[in-house]
UniProtKB/Swiss-Prot annotation:
This is Pantothenate kinase. It catalyses: (R)-pantothenate + ATP = (R)-4'-phosphopantothenate + ADP + H(+). Signal peptide: none annotated. Pfam families: PRK. Its EC number is 2.7.1.33. It comes from Shewanella sp. (strain MR-4). The lineage of its organism: Bacteria, Pseudomonadati, Pseudomonadota, Gammaproteobacteria, Alteromonadales.
């Protein structure tokens, strides 16, 4: 178990892929190849072997942690003489654009649902809490989309606080990657899940990162277990460019797409534009706001070439 980063070495237990995979401990595979196909994102190459080696041990770990939290809650309820509470266990998944957070979140949701202790697992992405496109334009934040200031943090924190407090039904806005905007009049309802997975760029931020008020609550204040999906920046940029080319052939070809004007680009033209977007928006956001929060995570999944997990770091 080694880590090149001295901070990570001090804070984490480091597992190579083979070491981590044995911790599955006979947990059965509950996904088929078709299930996995439905969970994959654009330009993702996750295989059933990846699920077996990486995600099944992780689902076992999370199941043990959630059960321990549930037992502690029952003890506290008995001590206080009150009815069992309905506060969900909240897992956050952070990381860069194009690292595969969404696919990781969907796979974990599918696996965790199969444990009898917590069959109801909801997944919410923070994309829906981006300010509406018109507001971003008005505030001059369109070129800062994805940066912390482009999110309605008040709405996001109020949402997660309501879910954590056990409120019966809590609505979250829905985001469209086609229109590049919130979908008006539509929402996702979260109704007292056993586990809520919250996926987004900046979910590991704390009040210390806020230029406004270090005292106000942040998403991380409500999270029970946090995961950071990590990769070297040159790989992230490469994956972003590859994904951009895939979108150009797919989603961008939709006339309703905000990026429809990119659909007719040649490969070379598309690569130039994708590289510019990375260098001016996604790269700086990673360096300034996302990567500095990495060592706050309880668990880091490190990816290498071809999106394959190479190491897992678990907080001591």
């Amino acid at each position: 178990m080694t880590s090149k980063n001295p901070i990570q070495k001090a804070l984490y237990l480091a597992f190579e892929r083979a070491q981590w995979s044995v911790l599955r401990d006979a947990v059965p595979m509950t996904l088929s190849e078709q299930d996995l196909e439905n969970l994959r994102g654009i330009n993702e190459k996750v295989s059933l072997t990846e699920v077996t080696d990486i995600y099944l041990p992780l689902s076992r770990l999370l199941n043990l942690i959630v059960k321990a939290k549930q037992q502690r809650g029952l003890v506290l309820d008995e001590f206080l003489g009150q009815k069992p509470s309905s506060s969900p266990y909240i897992i956050s998944i952070a990381g860069s654009v194009a690292v595969g957070k969404s696919t990781t979140a969907r796979i974990l949701q599918a696996l965790l649902r199969h444990w009898p202790e917590h069959p109801k697992v909801d997944l919410v992405t923070t994309d829906g809490f981006l300010y509406p496109l018109a507001d971003l334009k008005r505030k001059g934040l369109l070129q800062r989309k994805g940066f912390p200031e482009s999110y309605d943090m008040k709405m996001l924190v109020e949402f997660i606080a309501a879910v954590k407090s056990g409120q019966a039904h809590v609505n979250a806005p829905i985001y469209s990657h086609v229109t590049y905007d919130r979908i008006r009049g539509q929402h996702q309802t979260v109704s007292q899940p056993d586990i809520l997975i919250l996926e987004g760029l900046n979910v590991l931020q704390t009040g210390l990162d806020s230029p406004v008020d270090i005292r106000r609550p942040f998403v991380s204040d409500f999270v029970d277990f946090s995961i950071y999906v990590d990769a070297e920046e040159h790989l992230l940029k490469q994956w972003y460019q590859e994904r951009f080319l895939q979108f150009r052939k797919g989603a961008f070809s939709d006339e309703k797409s905000y990026f429809h004007h990119y659909a007719s680009l040649t490969d070379d033209e598309a690569n130039v534009i994708a590289a510019k977007i990375w260098d001016t928006i996604n790269g700086p956001n990673l360096q300034l706001n996302i990567q500095p929060t990495r060592e706050r995570a309880h668990l880091i999944l490190q990816k290498g070439q071809d999106h394959l997990m190479s190491h897992v770091l678990l907080r001591k």
